[in-house]
């Protein structure tokens, strides 16, 4: 694996983590608050 390819893969992984974790937290938070609001 070339250093360029390695850096590209790492940037994809880090970018995915930076996007996925807040999205997951937001979805869990919204689903919890929605549940309370509906009942």
UniProtKB/Swiss-Prot annotation:
Coiled-coil spans in chain: none
Keyword hit for Ion transport: no
Main location: membrane
Cited InterPro entries: PSII_PsbX (IPR009518), PSII_PsbX_type_1_subfam (IPR023431)
Gene3D superfamilies reported in the protein's UniProt record: Single helix bin (1.20.5.510)
Compartments (UniProt record): Cellular thylakoid membrane
Membrane-topology descriptor: Single-pass membrane protein
Transmembrane parts of this sequence: 8-28
Assigned GO CC terms: photosystem II; plasma membrane-derived thylakoid membrane
Pfam families documented for this protein: PsbX
UniProt KW keywords: Membrane, Photosynthesis, Photosystem II, Thylakoid, Transmembrane, Transmembrane helix
One GO term (biological process): photosynthesis
Superkingdom field: Bacteria
UniProt similarity note: Belongs to the PsbX family. Type 1 subfamily.
Subunit relationships: PSII is composed of 1 copy each of membrane proteins PsbA, PsbB, PsbC, PsbD, PsbE, PsbF, PsbH, PsbI, PsbJ, PsbK, PsbL, PsbM, PsbT, PsbX, PsbY, PsbZ, Psb30/Ycf12, peripheral proteins PsbO, CyanoQ (PsbQ), PsbU, PsbV and a large number of cofactors. It forms dimeric complexes.
Role noted for this protein: Involved in the binding and/or turnover of quinones at the Q(B) site of photosystem II (PSII). PSII is a light-driven water plastoquinone oxidoreductase, using light energy to abstract electrons from H(2)O, generating a proton gradient subsequently used for ATP formation.
Protein's UniProt name: Photosystem II reaction center protein X
Gene source species: Synechococcus elongatus (strain ATCC 33912 / PCC 7942 / FACHB-805)
């Amino acid at each position: 694996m070339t250093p360029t390819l390695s850096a590209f893969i790492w940037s994809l992984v880090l970018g995915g983590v930076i996007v996925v974790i807040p999205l997951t937290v937001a979805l869990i938070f919204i689903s919890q608050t929605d549940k309370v609001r509906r009942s």
